[in-house]
Amino acid sequence: MIEQYEGEAMTVGALFHRDFQKSLLVDMADALESMSCHYTGHVVSTQRSAQVDRWGQSTGTIREEYSQEPLKELQSKLGEREEKIIRAGFKHRKAGPMILSIREPSTNSGYFLVDLAFASDELGIPVEARKKEDRSSAKWRWRFTLKLLDLICGAPDCLYAGAGNEVDVPTPEEITTNKMMRQSLPAVWGLPSSLCDSRGRVTEDVLSSGCPAAVEQWNDHVTAIKVWSPLSVVPADHNAEAIVLGFLGTVL
């Protein structure tokens, strides 16, 4: 079985516009390996024709297995059996067990929801209750999370991404119909360069609104908009959050 993390989850999630059966899973695995997040050989699969909702529930039969084969080869073998991998286990020496999931929230939507979840540990402790050693560990874990966000958001075909403690990155339908769980929206959003001029517009809107949210150009691939930080007691900037959601609702 895939090794589970304990306690609350730190989640990095993203929406991708890509063919599920091609290389999304393998590309994500290769990217994670570059950050020393190693594939464990444990996967969960279901029938290729099955629908997997945003919560990971499949309309088909779920099957778990362990294989020493590389993930790409295992995926090919399962494909011959008309199956697809929907979860895979990874492990990082310091961050611990990690679970990579791929789901298709809406039938024939053309996009897929990818998330990587691992233990929040010290980031799950209220800021004011953290001890000195907790603060140091929390800072490392949050920086590690942001690096993962940058990595995933910068991947080809990423529409947008987000990260935070116990968060759910909303789908385009949830954004446009305002059916999001606002208490679980990302602490930081990642907007890829694929949004081009639109990305510049939203960052300018956030800055001109006087929002204290930090707009950071991480690199040529990703711009981050931080609504709140789990390292600070400063309240979430819901104005900046609303600008990001409004922007995504018009460009997707």
Regions found by a protein language model. Give the residues of each.
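A broad structural signal for short, well-ordered beta-strand segments within beta-sheet-rich domains
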Residues: Y39-T40, E128, K132, S136-S137, ...
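A solvent-exposed, charged loop/short amphipathic helix patch at secondary-structure junctions
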Residues: G110-A138
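C-terminal interaction module
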Residues: D19-H38, G154-Y160, D168-L252
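Acidic, metal/cofactor-coordinating or nucleic-acid-engaging core segments within structured domains
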Residues: R141-V167
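Leu/Val/Ala/Ile-rich N-terminal alpha-helices, chiefly Sec-type signal peptides and the beginnings
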Residues: M1-G60
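Short beta-alpha junction loops
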Residues: Q47-A50, N165-V169
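Well-ordered, non-membrane alpha-helical segments in soluble/globular domains
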Residues: K22-L32, K131-L151
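Short, intrinsically disordered low-complexity segments
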Residues: C37-F112
